[in-house]
Swiss-Prot record:
Residues 513-524 have a biased composition (Basic residues). It comes from the Eukaryota. Residues 490-512 have a biased composition (Polar residues). SUPFAM superfamilies: Cysteine proteinases. Belongs to the peptidase C19 family. USP17 subfamily. Residues 382-392 have a biased composition (Basic and acidic residues). One of its GO terms (biological process) is regulation of protein stability. It comes from Homo sapiens. Its main location: nucleus. This is Inactive ubiquitin carboxyl-terminal hydrolase 17-like protein 7.
């Protein structure tokens, strides 16, 4: 992995040879650095003292550092499948992985009030909140994501799912910023999104002649792993943090010797993210060809060996989502994902098809993006449902009192604007009504011989159907606030050989895929509505 890929935002360079008054982190992060910079050198004691004295709290804390709110309104079962229109499966697969990111979705499902949203109708955070709420409260159904989600990204071609994923995360992060133009980098890194997905790399340079030390801290939202010579995620991580010798042309300029000097460079993690996104670099930046090789990844990963502070106990992450690309290059193919619902069952999310699966199938994929969450965070958010009330989907209990959108408040800047809530959800749900869906379905109905997702009339005796396909009777319009007569999920968890088809929707565009141009380095701009 190239070093430049680590610079995803502003960086703070703590050089032990000079005092940089412009480099300030918040007090909590400064405390971590006091204990992590323990190298012994002739200059380390004095410079470390100056460094710590110079640190100050951030100008503005955009989100509280205490634990994120929990939600007892989250159904424990799996949510809806997503309808595919054209080459938008890269959108669907990214949305599903974000929907089952517990700290994010539970925050959006909470009913806490906050300030007025400054982005109004073009707020990506509000649009995602409406989608996640709708998807999680529509188990057994197929919904169509709002076109607003990809308005600033989609070009009518097949795009890269990881690019869209990070585009969406970054857009939500920007939506969390208050309506002030002047904000320092440190304040921007205190948003809700950065607290969930973000942390810091510590790049430490040790000069071999004078024994000086220079540290640079770079924020990140995901970690790219070079798998060219790695057979597992563990090997890829070890290669990433392995000390590198810097000699000759690669020598670093020493602030004490005032010349280039041999040095060693080491990457470690001074802070840990609640959610860890690992992207496996499968595609060539030049040709777009895919590196189709099996890379082993575990369901649990201890990240303590890669932390700046050692011997502080295990830091266990658990796998909760896997994004998979099926194909031979980034220009074509198909995306699907595996996600773990809050009750612990794994599901394969392939556009409209939602199929129960097992951990063996999950771990045998040629993964493209891996999603891990700290074990303590998973347990905390999972227990919130059982503590409040029995996990359920919107159903019989809602007959007497339907859940209205006014009740689905969120701890986000647009919670006190009910008109915006109504508009966003109405806009999202209108795109999936029967009238909008039936006409293109009749015009573009796939021929039987090309229907690769055709469901046979006779099912094996060991298959348990959670809900029937909506295709034959037409897709109904389901809203989060409407009551639903939904079938309860069986408590029996099938094995990999007992996969369950939980719904299917025929492709509106057939199974052919358009080719995709190489947009790896193209810039994206967020849509702004007037």
């Amino acid at each position: 992995m190239e070093d430049d890929s680590l610079y995803l935002g502003g960086d703070w360079q703590f050089n032990h040879f000079s005092k940089l008054t412009s480099s300030r982190l918040d007090a909590a992060f400064a405390e971590i650095q006091r204990t992590s910079l323990s190298e012994k050198s002739p200059l380390s004691s004095e410079t470390r003292f100056d460094l710590c004295d110079d640190l100050a709290p951030v100008a503005r804390q955009l989100a509280p550092r205490e634990k994120l709110p929990l939600s007892s309104r989250r159904p424990a079962a799996v949510g809806a499948g997503l309808q595919k229109i054209g080459n938008t499966f890269y959108v669907n697969v990214s949305l599903q992985c974000l929907t089952y990111t517990l700290p994010l979705s539970n925050y959006m499902l909470s009913r806490e009030d906050s300030q007025t949203c400054h982005l109004h109708k073009c707020c990506m955070f509000c649009t995602m909140q409406a989608h996640i709420t709708w998807a999680l409260h529509s188990p057994g159904h197929v919904i169509q994501p709002s076109q607003v989600l990809a308005a600033g990204f989609h070009r009518g071609e097949q795009e890269d799912a990881h690019e869209f994923l990070m585009f969406t995360v970054d857009a939500m992060k920007k939506a969390c910023l208050p309506g002030h133009k002047q904000l320092d980098h440190h304040s921007k890194d205190t948003t809700l999104i950065h607290q969930i997905f973000g942390a810091y790399w510590r790049s430490q340079i040790k000069y071999l002649h004078c024994h000086g030390v220079s540290d640079t801290f770079d924020p990140y939202l995901d970690i790219a792993l070079d798998i060219q010579a790695a057979q597992s995620v563990k090997q890829a991580l070890e290669q990433l943090v392995k000390p590198k010798e810097l000699n000759g042309e690669n020598a670093y300029h020493c602030g004490l010797c005032l010349q280039k000097a041999p040095a060693s460079k080491t990457l470690t993690l001074p802070t840990s993210a609640k959610v860890l996104i690992l992207v496996l670099k499968r595609f060539s930046d030049v040709t777009g060809n895919k590196l189709a090789k099996n890379v082993q990844y575990p369901k649990c990963r201890d990240m303590q060996p890669y932390m700046s502070q050692q011997n502080t106990g295990p830091l266990v992450y658990v796998l909760y989502a896997v994004l998979v690309h099926a194909g031979w290059s980034c220009h074509n193919g198909h995306y699907f994902s595996y996600v773990k619902a809050q009750e612990g069952q794994w599901y394969k999310m392939d556009d409209a098809e939602v199929t129960a699966s097992g951990i063996t199938s999950v771990l045998s994929q040629q993964a493209y993006v891996l999603f891990y969450i700290q074990k303590s965070e998973w347990e905390r958010h999972s227990e919130s449902v059982s503590r409040g009330r029995e996990p359920r989907a919107l159903g019989a209990e809602d007959t007497d009192r339907p859940a209205t959108q006014g009740e689905l408040k969120r701890d986000h800047p647009c919670l006190q604007v009910p008109e915006l809530d109504e508009h966003l959800v109405e806009r999202a749900t209108q795109e999936s009504t029967l009238d909008h869906w039936k006409f293109p379905q009749e015009q573009n109905k796939t021929k039987p011989e090309f229907n690769v997702r055709k469901v046979e009339g006779t099912l094996p005796p060991n298959v348990l159907v959670i809900h029937q396909s909506k295709y034959k009777c037409g897709m109904k319009n389901h809203h989060p606030e409407q009551q639903s007569s939904l079938l309860n999920l069986s408590s029996t968890k099938p094995t990999d050989q007992e996969s369950m088809n939980t719904g299917t929707l025929a492709s509106l565009q057939g199974s052919t895929r358009r080719s995709k141009g190489n947009n790896k380095h193209s810039k994206r701009s967020l849509l702004v509505c007037q």
